[in-house]
Amino acid sequence: MAAPTAAGLCPRLRAWLPRLTQVRWSRYNPSFLEPEVNKELYQKPFNELSEEEKEKQELKAVHPIKAAPPSISSSVFSDPMISKFTNMMMKDGNKVLARSLMAQTLENIKRKQLEKYHRAPDDEKERVECNPYVIFHQALKNCQPIIGLSNITRGGKTYQVPVPLKDNRKRFLAMKWLITECRENKHRRTLMPEKLSEELIQAFNNEGPIIKKKHVLHKMAEANRAYAHFRWW
C-alpha cells in the first residue's frame, strides 16, 4: 500500500506533519520563522521596539524557528565582512587555512600598531589606531571605487562606458584587488599574513598600490565620460 502524500491530507492534519510537506525541497514547512541574527535587537528594551518588532517577538513565542546558518556565530569577534573576505581568500576549499591566515593578519596589524603606539610621542598616541577590526573596515572602505567601466557595443564598436557601482560590487572589487595584490606582487619569502597586513595598513592611511589602482579606474572613467550617454539603464 502506497504511503499517503501531503497533497491528499487535510490542511489541519498537514500542519502537524511537516515531514510530508515539501516546499521546494526545504526541510522546514511555511510555519517556521526565520532566525533573528541581529545581536543589537536582543539588547533593546521591549519599550523601545517598534510595533513590527513587537509583533515578530510575539510570533516567535508560538511559532517554531529555523536553525541559524552555521556561518553565524554569537562571538564578539565574529564579523560578517571578515568572513566574506576569508571566503574570497580561500583556495581549494581549505577554509581552515584561510581562517588561520586571516587571524595571523589581524594579529600582525595589532602588533605593528602597538609598536607604533609605543614609539609615538605622548601627544600623538591618541591618533594611533590599534584596533585591527577598525583598520580592516576603514582600509576596505578606502579601497572601494565609486564608479567603474562597462563594455557596451554600439554600431559594431565596443565602448567602455562609466557606470556607478553598487555596494556589493564596490566591496567585491576592493577585496579582489587586495587579495590579488598580495598573491601576485609579494616576495617569495614573504608570508601572506605579513603582506596582507602591510597592504591593509597602507590602505588605512590612503596609501599603497590599491589606492593607486582605484584612482586609475576613476581617471579612466573620467576620460570616457563622453560615452556616458550610451548607458540607458
From Swiss-Prot:
Subcellular location(s) of the protein: Mitochondrion
This protein's UniProt keywords: Mitochondrion, Ribonucleoprotein, Ribosomal protein, Transit peptide
A Pfam entry, by short name: Ribosomal_S7
Single GO MF annotation: structural constituent of ribosome
GO cellular component: mitochondrial small ribosomal subunit; ribosome
GO biological process: mitochondrial translation; ribosomal small subunit assembly; translation
Stretch forming the transit peptide: 1-28
Coiled coil: none
Domain of life: Eukaryota
Chief location of this protein within or outside the cell: mitochondrion
Family statement drawn from the similarity comment of this UniProt entry: Belongs to the universal ribosomal protein uS7 family.
Subunit record text: Component of the mitochondrial ribosome small subunit (28S) which comprises a 12S rRNA and about 30 distinct proteins.
PANTHER family cross-referenced by the UniProt entry: RIBOSOMAL PROTEIN S7
Name of the protein in question: Small ribosomal subunit protein uS7m
Origin organism lineage: Eukaryota, Metazoa, Chordata, Craniata, Vertebrata
Gene that produces this protein: MRPS7
